Curated annotation (Swiss-Prot):
Binds 1 heme b (iron(II)-protoporphyrin IX) group per subunit. Binds 2 calcium ions per subunit. The lineage of its organism: Eukaryota, Fungi, Dikarya, Basidiomycota, Agaricomycotina. This is Manganese peroxidase. Has manganese peroxidase activity. Residues 18-35 have a biased composition (Polar residues). Belongs to the peroxidase family. One of its GO terms (biological process) is hydrogen peroxide catabolic process. Its cofactor is heme b; Ca(2+). The keyword Heme applies. Keywords: Heme, Hydrogen peroxide, Iron, Manganese, Metal-binding, Oxidoreductase, Peroxidase.
């Protein structure tokens, strides 16, 4: 994502929403893994 540097100047909200979605996806992946 090349828009990281630009979003930092404008507003970090869009990036935060993306990271939140990534965190959700990671948690789902971890839960789906067999223990």
């Amino acid at each position: 994502l090349s828009l990281l540097g630009h979003d930092e100047r404008v507003t970090p909200e869009p990036f935060d929403s993306v990271t939140a979605q990534n965190a959700r996806g990671n948690q789902a992946d971890v839960q789906s893994l067999p223990r």
